[in-house]
């Protein structure tokens, strides 16, 4: 079904009150520190996450600069170890995970018609303890022994008090625990909000795909983050109280790997699934079509969540202590529901009236990049290939294609998509496209070539290599493109600041024109409790039906949903005007 008809709902543009500027000095900072509004906390999460992302990117540039030529340039081996440890930690636990809760905080209550999250104070606690945990980890750089240097996977015995005796390592472990507590708090909040605060008519199978994905991610987070916290406390117990939980002499090294990866691989899907949801919200809007295979997408998400708990040991093939056929088969199997998602995304775009606004470009960039990462993941699921490629730069390339391709591309798509809803202003399309192409070219130039150098045998986590190894030209190409990737954040930062202050004002509920979920049925930005009134929810596309009531009968007929008895239900009447007045 293609929707191209003009609006006929008598829409009234909302009045946007401008700030007077008469508040006391410092009052904004105090309100920010004490707020429990899910929208403000969502924006704070996103800003905090991108701040850590920029810092982690600087660490990555130092790593790539060191590897530009053979020999140690300006970093010692110890400093190199600290940088790749903190780079991985910052990107995964201080950027990738918090930005999930940032988008969830802002968008999810709006999508289900809730006035706020279920536990506003717990929400604020989760944000601040995550921030404090991140600062604690990074403060390790200021300690005498430097920051943690045992890798973000914290393998034993590298993480014991003998091999990593510094205070920075202890602060890293405490910081990991704090960020884990913040994620558990957010997961409890999102899960309870979804189950208890949905608007009338918002059944589970009328929820947006993004909300469904956050639901599954919250369940996963409640299963895995307490395990990470307990395992990390065990490391602290060994370091400070002389325990032997992870002593290699009694198999403790393998125990740690099992505990860590039982957390670590589901965590990959905690990072990925929300961004699958973001892309699933964007593609229908700019394809002018409903999501193809809505129910199939939901069951694919549920399947990925379930299977993600059964594949952790594919990270341990080279230990020789896991059942190779089982974990290899499960890893191959989890690619099936992921393939279903790609099929649905492509099916949504098929014969649609596609327009290439910035959010859509980022979404297609996500699809291309993540698809390549998924294909190399299938290669690594084969034990014979994994034996050859383990701990090489092939693994680094696969990991970045999978996570950078998912988290960065889709989070940028989400920012460009929901920025008008958050701020009431449009972002600059030209700067957004410059940002995309610099990122796309810089990323693929940096990491595509690492597949080849990894296959040639270059190991990861080495600060140096020999000229005779033949790795030099590959590393130089990768480093040059990495600096292009680093430069790509400049138009993004400028776009955000420029648009926040001077961007085109949004005077309608749905600036994209074809939004489906409920956040597009209230003003930009929404009022304190989100809605003055809610439209009737009769499908998974309530905002579209609100703005295009003349198409409801056609949508029901083409969707074959069996809800034809709703066609003759009372019309929406003045609901559009009420929704538009929600900024008063």
Curated annotation (Swiss-Prot):
Query: So where does Cu cation get bound?
Result: 265, 269, 314-315
Annotated coiled-coil segments of the chain: none
- Please indicate if the UniProt record lists Cell membrane as a keyword: yes
Binding of heme a3: at which residues?
398
Q: Please list which residues make up the signal peptide.
A: none
Q: How does it assemble?
A: Associates with subunits II, III and IV to form cytochrome c oxidase. The 4 subunit cytochrome c oxidase forms a supercomplex with the menaquinol-cytochrome c reductase complex (cytochrome bc1).
Q: What keyword terms does UniProt attach to this protein?
A: Cell membrane, Copper, Electron transport, Heme, Iron, Membrane, Metal-binding, Respiratory chain, Translocase, Transmembrane, Transmembrane helix, Transport
Determine if Phosphoprotein is one of this entry's keywords: no
Q: Which gene encodes it?
A: ctaD
Pathway linked to the protein: Energy metabolism; oxidative phosphorylation
Q: What processes in GO biological process is this protein linked to? A: electron transport coupled proton transport; oxidative phosphorylation; respiratory electron transport chain
**Chief location bin:** membrane
Read off the CDD domains from this record: Ubiquinol_Oxidase_I
Q: Which Gene3D superfamilies match?
A: Cytochrome c oxidase-like, subunit I domain (1.20.210.10)
Q: What is its EC number?
A: 7.1.1.9
**Region Disordered, residue ranges:** 1-25, 564-584
What is the protein's given name? Cytochrome c oxidase subunit 1
Q: What does this protein's UniProt record list under function?
A: Cytochrome c oxidase is the component of the respiratory chain that catalyzes the reduction of oxygen to water. Subunits 1-3 form the functional core of the enzyme complex. CO I is the catalytic subunit of the enzyme. Electrons originating in cytochrome c are transferred via the copper A center of subunit 2 and heme A of subunit 1 to the bimetallic center formed by heme A3 and copper B.
Q: How does it sit in the membrane?
A: Multi-pass membrane protein
Q: What GO annotations for molecular function exist for this entry?
A: cytochrome-c oxidase activity; heme binding; metal ion binding
What family does the database annotate? Belongs to the heme-copper respiratory oxidase family.
Q: Where are the transmembrane segments?
A: 43-63, 90-110, 122-142, 171-191, 214-234, 259-279, 292-312, 316-336, 360-380, 399-419, 434-454, 477-497
Q: Which cofactors does this protein require?
A: Cu(2+); heme
């Amino acid at each position: 079904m293609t929707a191209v008809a003009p609006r006929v709902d008598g829409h009234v543009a909302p009045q946007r009150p401008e700030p007077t500027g008469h508040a006391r000095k410092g009052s904004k900072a105090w309100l920010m520190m004490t707020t429990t509004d899910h929208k403000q906390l969502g924006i704070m999460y996103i800003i905090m996450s991108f701040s850590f992302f920029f810092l982690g990117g600087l660490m990555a540039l130092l790593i790539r600069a060191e590897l530009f030529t053979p020999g140690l340039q300006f970093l010692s081996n110890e400093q190199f170890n600290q940088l790749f440890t903190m780079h991985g930690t910052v990107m995964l636990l201080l950027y990738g995970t918090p930005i999930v809760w940032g988008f969830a905080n802002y968008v999810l209550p709006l999508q289900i018609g809730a006035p706020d999250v279920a536990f506003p104070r717990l929400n604020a606690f989760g944000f601040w303890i995550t921030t404090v945990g991140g600062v604690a980890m990074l403060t390790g750089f200021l300690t005498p022994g430097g920051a943690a240097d045992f890798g973000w996977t914290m393998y034993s015995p590298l993480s014991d008090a003998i091999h990593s005796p510094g205070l920075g390592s202890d602060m890293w472990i405490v910081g990991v625990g704090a960020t884990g507590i913040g994620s558990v708090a957010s997961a409890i909040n999102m899960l309870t909000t979804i189950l208890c605060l949905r608007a009338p008519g918002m059944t589970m199978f009328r929820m947006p795909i993004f909300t469904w994905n956050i639901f599954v991610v919250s369940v996963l987070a409640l299963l895995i983050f307490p395990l990470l916290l307990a395992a990390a406390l065990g490391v602290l117990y060994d370091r400070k109280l002389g325990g032997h939980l992870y002593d290699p002499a009694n198999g403790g090294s393998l125990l740690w790997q099992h505990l860590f990866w039982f957390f670590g691989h589901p965590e990959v899907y905690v990072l990925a699934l929300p961004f699958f949801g973001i892309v699933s919200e964007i593609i229908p809007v700019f394809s002018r079509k409903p999501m193809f295979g809505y129910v199939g997408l939901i069951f694919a998400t549920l399947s990925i969540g379930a299977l993600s708990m059964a594949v952790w040991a594919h990270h341990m093939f080279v230990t020789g202590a896991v059942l190779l056929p089982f974990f290899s088969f499960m890893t191959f199997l989890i690619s099936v529901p992921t393939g279903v998602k790609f099929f649905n995304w492509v099916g949504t775009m098929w014969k649609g009236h596609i327009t290439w606004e910035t959010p859509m470009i980022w979404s297609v960039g996500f699809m291309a990049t993540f698809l390549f990462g998924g294909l190399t993941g299938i290669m690594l699921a084969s034990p014979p290939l994994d034996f050859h490629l383990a701990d090489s730069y092939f693994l680094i390339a696969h990991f970045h294609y999978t996570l950078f391709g998912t988290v960065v591309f889709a989070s940028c798509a989400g920012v460009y998509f929901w920025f008008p809803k958050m701020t009431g202003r449009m972002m600059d399309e030209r700067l957004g496209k410059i940002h995309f192409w610099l990122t796309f070219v810089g990323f693929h130039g940096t990491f595509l070539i690492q597949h080849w150098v990894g296959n040639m045998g270059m190991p990861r986590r080495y600060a140096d290599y020999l000229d005779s190894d033949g790795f030099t030209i590959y590393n130089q190409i990768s480093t040059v493109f990495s600096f292009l990737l680093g430069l790509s954040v400049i138009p993004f930062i400028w776009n955000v600041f420029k648009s926040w202050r001077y961007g085109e004002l949004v005077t309608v509920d749905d600036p994209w024109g074809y939004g489906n979920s409920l956040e597009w049925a209230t003003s930009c930005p929404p009022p304190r409790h989100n809605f003055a009134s809610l439209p009737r929810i009769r499908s998974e596309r309530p905002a579209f039906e609100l703005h295009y009531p003349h198409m409801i009968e056609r949508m029901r007929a083409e969707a074959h949903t069996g809800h034809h008895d709703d066609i003759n239900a009372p019309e929406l009447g003045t609901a559009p005007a009420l929704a538009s007045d929600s900024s008063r």
